[in-house]
């Protein structure tokens, strides 16, 4: 579809409400105003007017706002009609506007896409709009606002600017090799490069926090039947989310709960007890359990403390450990401490975390919550922080890798040309975050995930 078309969409959620808003953006916005309102409202002033049908009858009455480009959200002429929020009324008004020449329904995210294409905001800021709408906690919402206001973009621009200056210095050393001073070996370039690498690592740390706020942590509770997995889910969720009985195999499917630990979203997944299945339904549940385990950020390996004294996962259940991905973090949860009399607490055993608790009484649950938060490196104090997406983390990781490779070329061989190329690639990766260097395919995937009307 053409980006020169005039687009229209409902900007408020579907359904009934006190107010319903239609947004129009494009060169024909003023013509829509004349057709529906009978005049062009004074720019940036609220005007209370009737909204007219083609035969002159009144469809609704409400507030009209006109923002001529480039001083608008999209950078184009924008008209907003704020009427009553009944779906029938809004549908009639939408049909009236679409009947005008040159108008079409906006694609999901197309208003934000046009704002990006018209340099009203960069790609990270555009993504922050969707993140603000989807925020699941106050902390996530505040961080999304910071991103929308350019906090994340400013950090990226600082890195790009530093790389630009460094590239200029390196290129000068390459272009003027006969100068008396060997710029590549005098220590200045390495010092500047080390500074950029340190700054990038700080941004990566903050971005990981922002990603946790947005994406959350996926924790899977796994173990044998009747180990107390569902009781642990209920204890973490603070409600009776799962049925708990003494009958082994009560949980036959995957159960999901979404909670927050001091602002960090946590996706808890309770799974069917792992054993040889007795029937087809249980077999399917166990296979789903393994699928969830393989995609987890951390596994809580639930152990009935009354059945074994072992604390090493391989000693408790070697077959289970053999099937787990080698890099998947595990916390062994020895349950039923209220029965065994074990001392509550968290320890490290041969590289694995071990916690003793009672899911039934709730003793030790706060220790587990703190452990989960700390295991992901999450800090509650993110004042001035920003949200980050997985693609942002990947771009930052790629940039860091190129800088490391460039540093190796510098200190081992004083290879200026190779260093310059690594700096260019690092700069390119960072520019993908703000959209200064992005493929059309990437932009399409990002904006298609937005709401219609945004």
Curated annotation (Swiss-Prot):
Residues where GTP binds: 226-231, 245-251, 270-273, 335-338, 358-360
Binding site for Mg(2+): 230, 251
UniProt-listed Gene3D superfamilies: P-loop containing nucleotide triphosphate hydrolases, Probable tRNA modification gtpase trme, domain 1, tRNA modification GTPase MnmE domain 2
GO cellular component, one term: cytosol
Function of the protein: Exhibits a very high intrinsic GTPase hydrolysis rate. Involved in the addition of a carboxymethylaminomethyl (cmnm) group at the wobble position (U34) of certain tRNAs, forming tRNA-cmnm(5)s(2)U34.
Family: Belongs to the TRAFAC class TrmE-Era-EngA-EngB-Septin-like GTPase superfamily. TrmE GTPase family.
Name of the protein this chain belongs to: tRNA modification GTPase MnmE
Biological source species: Yersinia pseudotuberculosis serotype O:1b (strain IP 31758)
Species lineage: Bacteria, Pseudomonadati, Pseudomonadota, Gammaproteobacteria, Enterobacterales
Gene that produces this protein: mnmE
């Amino acid at each position: 579809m053409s980006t020169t078309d005039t687009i229209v969409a409902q900007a408020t959620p579907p359904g009934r409400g006190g107010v319903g808003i239609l947004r129009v953006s494009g060169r024909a916005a003023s013509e829509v105003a004349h057709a529906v309102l009978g005049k062009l409202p004074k720019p940036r002033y609220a005007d209370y007017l009737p909204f007219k049908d083609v035969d002159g009858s009144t469809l609704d009455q409400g507030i009209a706002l006109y923002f001529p480009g480039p001083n608008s959200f999209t950078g184009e002429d924008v008209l907003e009609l704020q009427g009553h929020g009944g779906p029938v009324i809004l549908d009639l008004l939408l049909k009236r506007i679409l009947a005008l020449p040159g108008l079409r329904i906006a694609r999901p995210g197309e208003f934000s896409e046009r704002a990006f294409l018209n340099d009203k905001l960069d790609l990270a800021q555009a993504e922050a709009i969707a993140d603000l709408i989807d925020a699941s906690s106050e902390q996530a919402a505040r961080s999304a606002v910071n991103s929308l206001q350019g906090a994340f973009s400013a950090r990226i621009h600082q890195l790009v600017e530093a790389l630009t200056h460094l590239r200029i210095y390196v290129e000068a050393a390459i272009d003027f090799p006969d100068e008396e001073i060997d710029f590549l070996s005098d220590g200045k370039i390495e010092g500047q490069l080390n500074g950029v690498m340190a700054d990038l690592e700080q941004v990566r740390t903050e971005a990981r926090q922002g990603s946790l706020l947005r994406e959350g942590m996926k924790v899977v509770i796994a173990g044998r039947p009747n180990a107390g997995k569902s009781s642990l889910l209920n204890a973490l969720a603070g409600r009776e989310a799962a049925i708990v009985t003494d009958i082994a195999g009560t949980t036959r499917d995957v159960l999901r709960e979404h909670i927050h630990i001091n602002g960090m979203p946590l996706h808890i997944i309770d799974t069917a007890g792992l054993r040889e299945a007795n029937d087809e339904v249980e077999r399917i549940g166990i296979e789903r359990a393994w699928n969830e385990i393989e995609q987890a950020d951390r596994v809580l390996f639930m152990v009935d403390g009354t059945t074994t004294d072992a604390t090493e996962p391989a000693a408790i259940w070697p077959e289970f450990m053999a099937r787990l991905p080698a890099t998947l973090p595990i916390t062994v949860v020895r349950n039923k401490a209220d029965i065994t009399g074990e001392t509550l607490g968290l320890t490290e055993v041969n590289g694995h975390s071990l916690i003793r608790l009672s899911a039934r009484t709730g003793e030790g649950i706060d220790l587990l919550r703190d452990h989960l938060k700390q295991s992901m490196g999450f800090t509650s104090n993110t004042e001035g922080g920003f949200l980050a997406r997985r693609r942002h983390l990947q771009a930052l990781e790629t940039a860091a890798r190129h800088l490391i490779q460039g540093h190796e070329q510098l200190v081992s061989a004083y290879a200026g040309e190779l260093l310059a190329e690594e700096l260019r690639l690092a700069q390119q990766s960072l520019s993908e975050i703000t959209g200064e260097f992005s493929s059309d395919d990437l932009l399409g995937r990002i904006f298609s995930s937005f709401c219609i009307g945004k």
